[in-house]
Amino acid sequence: MYELTPEQRTLQTQARELAQSVFASTAVQTDLTEQYPWDNVAQLRDAGFMGMMLPTSVGGRGLSTLDTVIVIEEMAKACATMGRITVDSNLGAIGAITKYGSEEQIKLAADLVLAGDKPAICISEPNAGSAASEMTTRADKNGDHYILNGEKYWITGGGVSKLHLIFARVFDDGVEQGIGAFITVLDDHGPEGLKVGRRLYAMGVRGIPETHLEFHDLKIHKSMMITFPDGLKRGFAALMSAYNAQRVGAGAVALGIAQCAFEEGVAYLKRREQFGRPLAEFQGLQWMVADMSVQLEAARLMLRSAAVSGETFPDINKAAQAKIFAAETANKVTNDALQFFGSSGYGRHNPMERHVRDARMFTIAGGTAQILRTQVASKILDMKLPQTRDGYLKAAQNSKR
């Protein structure tokens, strides 16, 4: 059903050649130094793998979500950090701006991404993670500008990204209008009022900094706010739909990491001997290999199915289902592959422990496996489950009556 076209196979080959010839050899260094791989990003840009889905009218390639997912898996198979950078430079913030932004906003974003920038999407806060609608960062209208104050948390690319898409509660004359999205560009010249806070050192995918962002009277012109004719409340839902593609992309990173661990584990089983024969001859390990291959192929099919669903962005439930399965598969497969190596797999000299660490983030970032299950269930059961603290309290009270 999802047989790749000749063009997609060519794209896959091109991505694989770059990833394996350049990114695979620097994956260990990227993990150990925890430094952003600027040279690799430049090669990703030069190969045309940043801004792939941008329309040709602004310099992009006009590729599909499925095309992008194919590339992401290959990048992640070589280096998890490069897989994540490929996601963020093609999906999420740039996708939302391309779909809902003005011509001026699209051109600004396209020029930055095509020049090698990895955009940062700024939603999460210290007290608003899965419940994103509980964010407290606010944007107060002041003439032709909005003044932003607040804090964001776990911002991927903080300190290296230029393009930022910031979500905040919008107020006009003290009256809340809803949650809006604002575009700003951080460079050596500012803007004043945007501060990159402390770095949050992560367990895996260490080549991209995760930081706090602080807004202290950050001034953004009204032309850099994404507007909707139906108002901000419906606009927020539309903007968040861009996250469906981001989730499919995140699942593809998890899959690439797991595929790499699987192939390395299988190769080890073939060459390692114990009790006078290769480990590959032990039936218990053979069954583990079979199960891992089934899980990987199922995850790949689910991700590709999600990628081609929906009109503008992937279907919300298919994206959630695919991310849940791919992320949990990656955690299972990387741990099983490490088990093949025994104590050697536990050592830092072995790439297996890195694969396990890298895979771990994907049942958390971009929607935890638990909150995504809640989302999937609400759709299947035709229920609107409460997404705020007050909503859960009211639901609990009603259930006791």
Swiss-Prot record:
Name the residues that bind substrate. Answer: 243-244
Question: What top-level class of enzyme does the UniProt entry assign?
Answer: hydrolase
Effect of changing residue 84 to K: reported as:
Loss of activity
Reaction catalysis annotation: 3-sulfinopropanoyl-CoA + H2O = propanoyl-CoA + sulfite + H(+)
Q: Which cofactor does it need?
A: FAD
* Chain ranges passing through the membrane: none
Q: Which UniProt keywords apply?
A: FAD, Flavoprotein, Hydrolase
The cofactor remark states: Binds 1 FAD per subunit.
Marked site (Important for activity) residue numbers: 84
Q: Which molecular-function annotation in GO is an example for this chain? A: hydrolase activity
Residue positions binding FAD: 121-124, 130, 153-156, 272, 339, 343, 366-370, 387
Q: What is its EC number?
A: 3.13.1.4
Phenotypic consequence of gene deletion: Deletion of the gene completely impairs growth on DTDP or 3-sulfinopropanoyl (3SP) as the sole carbon source.
Q: What does this protein do?
A: Catalyzes the conversion 3-sulfinopropanoyl-CoA (3SP-CoA) to propanoyl-CoA by abstraction of sulfite. Does not show dehydrogenase activity. Involved in the degradation of 3,3'-dithiodipropionate (DTDP), a sulfur-containing precursor substrate for biosynthesis of polythioesters (PTEs).
**What NCBIfam families does this protein's entry cite?**
SulpropCoADesulf
Q: What else is known?
A: Does not catalyze the dehydrogenation of acyl-CoA thioesters. The absence of dehydrogenase activity is most probably caused by the absence of a catalytic glutamate residue in either of the two positions conserved throughout the acyl-CoA dehydrogenase family.
Q: Which family does it belong to?
A: Belongs to the acyl-CoA dehydrogenase family.
Fill in the subunit field for this protein.
Homotetramer.
Name used for this protein in its record: 3-sulfinopropanoyl-CoA desulfinase
Q: What is the lineage of its organism?
A: Bacteria, Pseudomonadati, Pseudomonadota, Betaproteobacteria, Burkholderiales
Q: Which gene carries the instructions for this protein?
A: acd
